[in-house]
Amino acid sequence: MMRDSPSIQGTLDAATQHALLAGRHADPFSVLGPHQAGAHTVVRVLAPGARTVMAVLPGGQRTPLLPMQPGLFENTVPGLQPGAPAAYRLCIEWEGGIQHTADPYAFGPVLDAAQLDHCAAGGWRYLAGLLGAHAASVDGCAGTRFALWAPNARRVAVVGDFNGWDGRRHAMRLRYPAGVWELFLPDVGPGARYKFQVLGADGHTVLKADPLARQAEAPPATASIVPDERPFAWTDEAWMEQRAARQRCDAPISIYEVHAGSWFDDAGAPRWQSLAARLPEYARSLGFTHIELLPVMAHPFGGSWGYQPLGLFAPAAAHGAPADFAHFVDRCHEAGLGVILDWVPAHFPDDAHGLARLDGTPLYEHADPREGRHPDWNTLIYNYGRREVRAFLIASAIHWLRHYHVDGLRVDAVASMLYRDYSRPAGQWIPNRHGGRENLEAIDFLRELNAAVGVQCPGAITVAEESTAWPGVTAPVANGGLGFDYKWNMGWMHDTLRYMRRDPIHRRHHHHDLSFGMVYAYAERFVLPLSHDEVVHGKGSLLGKMPGERAAQLAQLRLYYAFMWAHPGKKLLFMGGEFGQQGEWNHDAMLQWSLLDDPAHRGLQRLIADLNHVYATLPELHCRDADPSGFAWIVGDDADNSVLAFARVDASHCLVAVCNFTPVPRPGYRFGVPHAGDWRVRVDTGATRYGGAGGGPPICLRSEPIPAHGHPQSLVLDLPGFTALYLRHSE
């Protein structure tokens, strides 16, 4: 064992020595590592807690570095030529053993200057590859390159398992003017936990998780993890080649919305592995085309369902490793399912280890709470006017779409981004530069985001959760729109659910709640969403919204689903809705799968499968979703009977949906049809296979030359109560 070395005065002044040992020195490369001293090379090493330090040359020559103070070592190293990082290694004796490593302060700058300039100018293209923790080999030495954007920080160090979380040991180099701090640490590899210790502009020292970490600890732990960067072995080439066609506005899109943590409890099995084995096949068997996941990004509070994320580049560790998530996506693609992620660029939580005041200033957020704090969620709002923040968010979006082969992003809370006065009373918001309420910077960001996705991720889609009548959400950016592919139709959802909650005897007075959606159905490219938001916070389940006894509730839910699947717009249904979950969704418990022991609930599930099949295989139900010529009212004004009938058409086919929203049968109900001939029943929600009582119309009906509702031909049938029928014209 080496003996403690005698101390020396050293060549550093006392103030510099004190700053290094106190963790306050802002430019460690100016004093640590190899430095020319006349004709000789001096090596200085800061290793608090070390007993001895040796500099070892490639030929084996060993030079002891002598302590100026405990933990700060220096000596002239004979034969050492400066400028060659591999010219020596360090042999450090700690209380627990010997460490052999290259000297981090022997390496020059490791980040590409041109790429840094690009990022500093607001470019996102290189951001995910520059910042964060990345495996690197520098001058033949393997390790990890760390980088953090913190332009106003006085000092930044990387701390972790590899240095005992001692912020003095690995202070970073500032790359001015980009405001990025960097350090290459030899011998640090995948799995190492780390954080950044930041001495902020406000004089406070804080520990921050890596904003661009690609792996993170599971809460309540908050450290980032150096990722394993071995590429995943994807098998989805065929899917990726055809996904653009599967996601166009003329394609059938039926989305199964899932919270990964509560879909199924597989006795403690890793979540993504368990889901990969079950969920894709289940969704495929029911005819869904996509799975949409509530946010999977790392988030500190499970009760937020992921909508308050802090790790915009890392899958939540509670569900498994990043490779497990990639495997899940790959399995979905193997099953013919697209994967959409909910993504949250609207706000972020103010947890101490997160983005809030990251460098001692409001860096990612606004300084003024009238712009920077969200009144609904008590979270912080991104400063979209800052080019580096926009680049950070766009880099996150592209990361999920490219690195994980995700097929789309559903952008959360877009309305809160578009309006400066969103949920704010008078006097509590700041107008834009023109004196208006529109958030011009957020508008520019959304347009830039959608343009980037379109160029960088061909075939991927973006979907806006936008709850107002903002014009042009799905219009092209070139035409002044925001550039989304689809928008959630929140108005349709609110109107129709409000209607369904009413006692059927009163529905005649609210007929417009069902029909009004067609007034604006083609203003945007819409998704009809029955999402998680409708089964939480005391709203009850979808089944529970239906009035009456259990049999009536199930009949009305079947009717409502058939109305929705026939209505123009892509479909979205939250998990549990497919079999009539009775209780409100609880993110801490799995779905009520035991309900499928009941034939009535199995029948509802079977109806969803049949609706998806009919929707996907009959082109008139999807190919003109964005074209007004694909829809025509037949009976839109029969409020007294609470009956609706409408046609869905394409160039060669016609399907008529007839819906009775009361329990009262309508015998001899006549309605016009566009074509003479036979009309076959494709769906009858009252059929026994769906849990109904049966007794519906015959499988085939022939039109009569009796004019009705503006058509020379008509059908007449006995229309059961709480029933929807799909009738397709036979060529």
Curated annotation (Swiss-Prot):
It catalyses: Transfers a segment of a (1->4)-alpha-D-glucan chain to a primary hydroxy group in a similar glucan chain. SUPFAM superfamilies: (Trans)glycosidases, E set domains, Glycosyl hydrolase domain. One of its GO terms (cellular component) is cytosol. It is an enzyme of class 2 (transferase). Pathway: Glycan biosynthesis; glycogen biosynthesis. Keywords: Carbohydrate metabolism, Glycogen biosynthesis, Glycogen metabolism, Glycosyltransferase, Transferase. GO terms for molecular function: 1,4-alpha-glucan branching enzyme activity; cation binding; hydrolase activity, hydrolyzing O-glycosyl compounds. HAMAP family: GlgB. Monomer. This is 1,4-alpha-glucan branching enzyme GlgB. The lineage of its organism: Bacteria, Pseudomonadati, Pseudomonadota, Betaproteobacteria, Burkholderiales. The gene is glgB.
